[in-house]
């Protein structure tokens, strides 16, 4: 009986940790999608989710790790104005779709952005101020973003 109870408790703890970590992973992904593309409609949000997935596959990192890598998604940079709004973003009407994407990242089709690994606003790209994008042509455009394969 004691072994059975211990096994049950161990399994419940395992489930709780798994659920909590998945929730945390999905939350970070949903927040990233919202911060980066909430004004670009579903297509723009989907494109950002696809970029997260491409980076995850290429770098062999979890979606959360990809989102939180320094200087990869500006919304997580310490001085970015979106950083302070991350929890608030989850209250927006677009959050439902962001959560849906975050829960179903395995189903996101990365071909919609031609396997792009990077993106920026079209406006910023046209300024030529970003070194890594100089002389590069976008492989896709979604919402206000240009997507690049580096």
Q: Could you tell me what each predicted segment is?
A:
Residues 2-18:
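Single-pass alpha-helical membrane anchors
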Residues 1, 5-7, 23, 67:
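Low-complexity, intrinsically disordered regions enriched in charged/polar residues
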Residues 19, 24-150:
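Bacterial extracytoplasmic/cell-wall-associated proteins, especially those involved in peptidoglycan
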């Amino acid at each position: 009986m004691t072994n059975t109870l211990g096994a049950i408790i161990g399994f419940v703890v395992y489930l709780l940790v798994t659920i909590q970590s998945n929730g945390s992973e999905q939350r970070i992904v949903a927040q990233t999608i919202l911060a980066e593309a909430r004004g670009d409609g579903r297509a723009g949000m989907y494109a950002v989710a696809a970029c997260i997935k491409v980076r995850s596959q290429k770098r062999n990192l979890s979606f959360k790790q990809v989102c939180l890598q320094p200087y990869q998604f500006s919304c997580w940079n310490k001085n970015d104005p979106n950083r302070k709004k991350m929890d608030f973003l989850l209250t927006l009407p677009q959050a439902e779709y962001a959560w849906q994407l975050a829960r179903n990242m395995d189903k996101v089709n990365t071909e919609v952005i031609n396997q792009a690994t990077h993106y920026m606003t079209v406006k910023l790209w046209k300024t030529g101020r970003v070194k890594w994008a100089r002389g590069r042509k976008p492989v896709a455009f979604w919402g206000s973003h240009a997507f690049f394969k580096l």
